[in-house]
Amino acid sequence: MSQYKTIAESNSFIVLDKFTKYFEVNEAPAIYQTEAALEKEFIQDLINQGYENPTNLNTLEAMLANVRVQIQSLNNVEFLDGEWTRFVEEYLDKPSDNLVEKTRKIHDNYIYDFVFDDGHIQNIYLVDKINITRNKIQVISQFEQTGTNANRYDVTILVNGLPLVQVELKKRGVAI
């Protein structure tokens, strides 16, 4: 086993002077790598870094249910079904919001004052920007999106259940 020198360390992370990819240690080197193999390697690297890899998130309904679980966990709250529907319609996936307004929710307006059915008001966070380790990071593959444009992304990274990064992988040597 190689010896590594620590460059920086905190309670949340560690930076070492050298990084060896999982596949380099555990697999024979491949001369030709398919796009599927590249995707598998990328996902495994993310899993090795602590990302969860739920395999049941293949429909819009499953994604929305996952967002609910993650938002409830982040905010230490339990939504009733009616409250969750209202939260989604009033704020999270407001029908009148365009792409820019939805993006602003993550960057600027990521805290929403939600009034629960019993009358109490609570700040609901989409992401925790102060203590980032509280955010749940997940990676899924081959999620199909329908709508005005039907897309299927190779890898999608979810932050608290929200699809914030979509990656389209290409095998080496192929012009894009």
List each language-model region with its residue ranges.
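An alpha-helical interface "stripe"
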Residues: M1-I176
